[in-house]
Regions:
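Canonical positions in the second alpha-helix
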Residues: 63, 103-104, 138-139, 169-173, ...
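Residue-level recognition of tetratricopeptide repeat
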Residues: 79, 83-86, 121, 155, ...
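Alpha-helical adaptor scaffolds
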Residues: 112, 118-121, 217-220, 313-385
Length: 423
């Protein structure tokens, strides 16, 4: 399996990382209950909020610490830092956001709902999911009926592999638009891809009518729409959606990554290489480096592909002290037969952090590639237990079941696995 099939999963969070919790920080975006009519409202102009991000941060930094007991300024700083991370990919901004959020909570430990939500967004981005859920639960203790906070808890349940818990929370808020993105994630994991696409389309259309929606958030939704379209095999729709995302925010990392995958699916190698290069310039993570190397290799650019591979290996060897790229590194190493025992160890560590279907898939694939077939069989069965249609998981399942019998798998998934194996 090539690097292009590595998928950066964000839950509500995504994606990228921290998407749902981030969205919950924008009440106008998530908390409204008004449904779109039969005809979607016209999209409004994009707010160029990223242009004043540095100025906003500089101003807030100049005010921080001036007033004893100030909980508002550090909380606002945390929000701005985290948003700048999503726009530019500097993990240092996430660390700054954590310090700011904790200063806000130190100033007002009780009832600081926004401070807890900010901290949860940071911790989710850092893949410290259990700590993030604890912060959300503290916030919900003060505001139990808040749909945005409930959506955050459901998103974290999905990250932790608690599909039942997420489903129960979502059912408590039927038809609330605050849940469109996280419910779409649930639909995706449980094999209801058409429903997932419809929910994201509704969230996207709604966000596009609200001027105060951050440009990066709007682009993320269009990119997410493209990701789901690509997962469904609708390459044309995926291309349109990523084009829209990049028109909204031209340097959106997730949109560029998906655009590179779309170009590879279309056989447009120059475009795939160009989009991957743009993504690498923002954040050289294992996924985009893998895509770039694939495109370069396919174009016969041997020296460039070797250089990209060296960079990726350096990233994998140095590792990520914060472990936010663990799964990507494990999958890339397994795909390319590089340090497969190391990849398996990373996948085991990732599973201990969040036991969702993608963690089980990563463990299954790294186990298979390192010859641990019994573990591969057990883990791929867990990855498939909710009926996902994810092509990468099905491809892994096809290769694993080719070496083992499929008696542990649900009969419903066998035809999809066989179809994937035939292709």
């Amino acid at each position: 399996m090539s690097g292009r099939r590595i998928k950066l999963r964000l839950s509500a969070a995504l994606v990228a990382a921290g998407a749902l919790v981030a969205l919950a920080a924008w009440p106008a975006y998530l908390s409204g209950k008004t449904q779109l009519g039969s005809r979607a409202a016209a999209a409004v102009a994009v707010k160029p909020d990223w242009r004043v991000r540095d100025a906003n941060i500089a101003f807030l930094e100049s005010r921080a610490g001036r007033v004893r007991g100030d909980m508002l300024t550090p909380r606002m700083l945390a929000t701005e830092y985290l948003q700048r991370y999503r726009e530019r990919g500097d993990i240092g901004d996430v660390q700054r956001a954590e310090r700011a959020a904790r200063r806000s909570l130190a100033a007002q430990p009780r009832g600081n709902i926004a401070g807890e939500a900010s901290l949860a967004g940071v911790l989710l981005t850092l893949h410290r999911f259990r700590e993030a859920k604890a912060a959300v639960l503290r916030a919900r203790a003060w505001r139990r009926d808040d749909a945005g906070l409930a959506a955050e808890e459901a998103a974290l349940d999905l990250e932790l592999g608690d599909v039942g818990g997420a489903r129960r929370i979502i059912a408590t808020f039927p038809e609330d638009t605050a849940f469109d993105v996280v419910a779409a994630r649930l639909d995706e994991e449980t094999g209801h891809l058409d429903d997932a696409r419809a929910r994201v389309a509704r969230a996207m259309a709604r966000a596009d009518t609200i001027y105060d929606t951050p440009a990066e958030r709007r682009a993320w939704l269009h990119a997410r729409s493209g990701e789901l379209a690509l997962e469904a095999g609708d390459v044309a729709a995926a291309g349109r959606a990523t084009g829209e995302a990049l028109a909204i925010f031209p340097t959106h990392l997730r949109a560029l990554t998906i655009a590179a995958r779309v170009a590879l699916a279309n056989g447009d190698l120059p475009a795939a290489e160009a989009q991957a290069q743009r993504a690498v310039a923002i954040q050289p993570n294992p996924e985009v480096l893998g895509l770039l190397g694939d495109a370069q290799s396919a174009r016969g650019e041997t020296a460039a592909a070797a250089a990209t591979r060296d960079v990726l290996l350096a990233v994998a060897r140095i590792g990520d002290a914060l472990h936010v790229n663990d799964r990507l590194i494990a999958l890339w190493e397994a795909d390319h037969g590089v340090r497969v025992d190391h990849a398996y160890g990373i996948a085991r560590r990732d599973l201990a952090v969040r036991d969702d279907i993608y963690a089980e898939d990563a463990l299954a694939w790294t186990a298979a590639r390192s010859g641990r077939w019994a573990i591969a069989r057990e883990s791929i069965a867990k990855a498939l237990r909710y009926g996902t249609h994810d092509p990468a998981i099905l491809r892994h399942a096809a290769e694993i079941t080719a070496h083992l019998d499929a008696s542990d798998l649900s009969p419903a998934v066998i035809p999809r696995i066989r179809a994937m194996a035939a292709n």
